């Protein structure tokens, strides 16, 4: 056995690897892992998934674990359905509200003071917690990784699968550690930090990976700043951050 192999075998697991292992239910010959999903967020563009669910005569497996929050086409002012700019966006929200009520999901409706951008509401309301596996039909679901969870975006068919089973088949990404040393200078924001990282590794540098951020500069970030860094992991091509 080579020294390299010994190091690989004895290396402590990263946070991503621990969460993946803790949520693993089964694996298949294609190299995919069946993961249990702790939190599922859906928005008004999730109608395709609900159509698939109902078309297959399936029910939501764990309604309490899914949170429906209209946020993609909601108006910046006004809390009534009539405030929407056109009939199409009104129909999308009505559809989400109807599906949420029909399936007894957690709904943050238009007049709910907790409602906002999904990836802000989850951390702000304590729905997103460390160690969780989290999905949403939105690429920037990685934002929730800032709180120490594994969070990634999924497509409509996967959203339907999560609704029906509270599980998801996924190939295991590789892990990439990015160590940001030192302290930020005055005026350097979290967005500058992540843009600097993307500038170093490239817009596809994180492809096939979950990026795990470390180092003094990261430790000194506020939660809000960490949300920004993890949000933009997608711009580095990563699966999550």
Enumerate the predicted regions with their spans.
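Fe-S-dependent hydro-lyases/dehydratases of central metabolism
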Residues: 1-241
């Amino acid at each position: 056995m080579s020294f390299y192999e010994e190091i690989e075998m004895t290396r402590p697991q990263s946070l991503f690897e621990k969460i993946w292992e803790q949520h693993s239910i089964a694996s298949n010959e294609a190299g995919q892992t069946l993961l249990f999903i702790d939190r599922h967020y859906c928005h008004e563009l999730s109608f395709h998934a609900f159509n698939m669910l109902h078309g297959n005569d399936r029910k939501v497996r764990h309604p309490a674990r899914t949170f429906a929050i209209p946020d993609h086409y909601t108006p910046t002012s006004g809390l009534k359905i009539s405030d929407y700019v056109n009939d199409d966006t009104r129909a999308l929200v009505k559809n989400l509200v109807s599906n949420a009520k029909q399936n007894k999901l957690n709904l943050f409706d238009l007049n709910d003071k907790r409602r906002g951008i999904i990836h802000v509401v989850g951390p702000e309301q304590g729905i997103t917690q460390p160690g969780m596996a989290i999905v949403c039909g939105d690429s920037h679901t990685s934002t929730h990784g800032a709180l120490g969870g594994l969070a990634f975006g999924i497509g409509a068919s996967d959203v339907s699968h999560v609704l029906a089973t509270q599980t998801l088949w996924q190939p295991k990404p590789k892990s990439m550690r990015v160590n940001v040393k030192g302290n930020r200078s005055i005026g350097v924001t979290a967005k500058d930090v992540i843009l600097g990282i993307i500038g170093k590794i490239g817009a596809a540098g994180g492809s096939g990976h979950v990026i795990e951020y470390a180092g003094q500069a990261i430790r000194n970030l506020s939660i809000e700043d960490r949300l920004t860094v993890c949000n933009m992991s997608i711009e580095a091509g990563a699966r999550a951050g």
